Regions:
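Short secondary-structure boundary segments
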Residues: 7, 78-80, 104
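Short secondary-structure boundary/capping segments
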Residues: 11, 18-20, 45, 82, ...
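Conserved sugar-transfer catalytic core signal across GT-A, GT-B, and GT-C glycosyltransferases
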Residues: 17-18, 62, 102
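Hydrophobic hinge/microswitch elements
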Residues: 29-91
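Generic preference for hydrophobic
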Residues: 3-4, 27, 75, 92, ...
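Flexible hinge/capping segments at coil-to-helix
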Residues: 1-27
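A late-sequence structural motif
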Residues: 12, 91-134
Length: 139
């Protein structure tokens, strides 16, 4: 997970940041029913803090557009932020917190038992995850 900030924001120069250092900033977040918003609210509750929300949007592209327009900063998956940073003036600052490293798994009973299109999907997801871990993207 990263903190997305406008490219010219003072925090854009940081190598990383703790989530606790961002909660008092104006935030752009996904809608309340989203998993990421619920998780951030849970983290804030554990810290006895409230996330300072400026606006809630429906997707990461909209969040990045709001960040680019200096409406606020946004916590989001690194892959989403970097994808939009290619076309928008935003910077991605990695979060230092342990919880910010997400491990995603693909679970199937039998990979060999899947239809070819499903195996292709699993292969694509695994390749994308490996590329993201190396800081690359796949087409």
């Amino acid at each position: 997970m990263v903190l997305a900030v406008p490219a010219d924001h003072p925090l854009a120069r940081l190598e990383s940041i703790a989530f606790a250092d961002t909660v008092d900033l104006d935030h752009v977040s996904l809608h309340e029913a989203s998993a990421i918003h619920a998780y951030l609210r849970q983290i804030c509750n554990q810290m006895h803090k409230h996330l300072k929300l400026r606006i809630q949007v429906s997707n990461f592209e909209a969040a990045c557009r709001m960040v680019e327009s200096d409406v606020g900063v946004g916590i989001m998956p690194e892959a989403a932020a970097r994808r939009h940073a290619r076309t928008m003036r935003i910077a991605c600052v990695p979060l230092q917190d342990e919880w910010a490293v997400r491990e995603l798994q693909v679970c199937v009973r039998s990979l060999a038992g899947l239809p070819a299109f499903a195996r292709d999907l699993v292969d694509l997801l695994v390749a994308d995850a490996k590329a993201a871990a190396e800081g690359k993207t796949i087409a």
